[in-house]
Amino acid sequence: MANIKSQQKRILTNERRRLRNKSVKSSLHTAVRGFREAVESGDKEKAGELLLATSRKLDKAASKGVIHKNQAANRKSALARALNKI
């Protein structure tokens, strides 16, 4: 444990951020998994709805700094390509 007061505070804030980031990333994985399942089943309408929801989650994660904005863009384009292949 740190002896400096500011570092003790940083440890606490880092832990809170780590837990938030973990939660956001977990929900991203779940959203992407649901989209991929819809694509594999061939349900284009459901996949289209899930693409919008997943893209929104990716954008939110990028704006909060959980993932990089380019990573969000790359994932969104890959999901859109998968939808267009149906």
From Swiss-Prot:
Q: Which domain of life is it from?
A: Bacteria
Query: Could you mention a single GO BP entry for this protein?
Result: translation
Q: Which keywords annotate this record?
A: Ribonucleoprotein, Ribosomal protein, RNA-binding, rRNA-binding
The record's InterPro entries line, in alphabetical order, gives: Ribosomal_bS20, Ribosomal_bS20_sf
| Any single GO CC term annotated in Swiss-Prot or TrEMBL for this entry | cytosol
Q: Which GO terms describe its molecular function?
A: small ribosomal subunit rRNA binding; structural constituent of ribosome
Family, as annotated? Belongs to the bacterial ribosomal protein bS20 family.
Which PANTHER family does the record associate with it? 30S RIBOSOMAL PROTEIN S20, SMALL RIBOSOMAL SUBUNIT PROTEIN BS20C
Q: Which NCBIfam families does the protein's record reference?
A: S20
Instruction: Report the function annotation for this chain.
Output: Binds directly to 16S ribosomal RNA.
What's the protein name?
Answer: Small ribosomal subunit protein bS20
